[in-house]
């Protein structure tokens, strides 16, 4: 019975820690991904507006061609926000409307070889599904986090006796994995970027030879990854600090339960 309690307590603590890790990661992604200040800074840094305007040469829709060719910084920012809303299932169509007209800004043209085409619509549909899966995972993680946190507060004795260090060990393992990914990206970002896309997306439909999408977001990734990593680490440090304070509180002579 005692052994079973220990195993269950450790399992729940591992689930608590993993859910905290995933939630921290989701927050770390969402903060810069929905930040207009971040996008404005990146667009100005990389000269994104002029690069996007130049893609009007590939657009057949006359209204869309004119819109892109004369695009303003605010319109570029609005298009970026629309793309993010699409990925988060807040928009049904990747392309936008202006004055009641649908503008076919994003293309779906298969090239020979495949990566010389522009399968923006197909790829972003896949990205949307990936975001959707991520949101579902985070909702589950939030439920697990709250549930295990409540159980930990209720069953402090079992936590104290069996798994005071489990949070730190589990987070250490998670951080080790994160560190390997981070170091790989720092050494060869193109390799890490390609590997990520080959794991989560089929074929080469994510490789664009031209188009608004790749010119709008292509150079942002090198800027967003360090921000995500920094926010993620800060949130994990807060988690570790919270666990350490909780351990200190329940380990005090006044609160510590007697050992069996």
Which ranges hold each PLM region?
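Hydrophobic secretory-pathway targeting helix
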Residues: 1-39
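Short, aromatic-rich amphipathic segments at membrane interfaces
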Residues: 113-134, 211-224
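Membrane-helix exit/juxtamembrane interface segments
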Residues: 27-59, 185-195
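Juxtamembrane interface at the cytosolic side of transmembrane helices
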Residues: 2-15, 141-191, 238-260
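Juxtamembrane non-transmembrane "cap" segments at the membrane-aqueous interface
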Residues: 186-210
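Long, solvent-exposed extracytoplasmic domains/loops
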Residues: 39-127
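Hydrophobic, well-structured mid-protein blocks that either form specific transmembrane helices
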Residues: 118-157
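Terminal transmembrane helical module of multi-pass membrane proteins
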Residues: 204-255
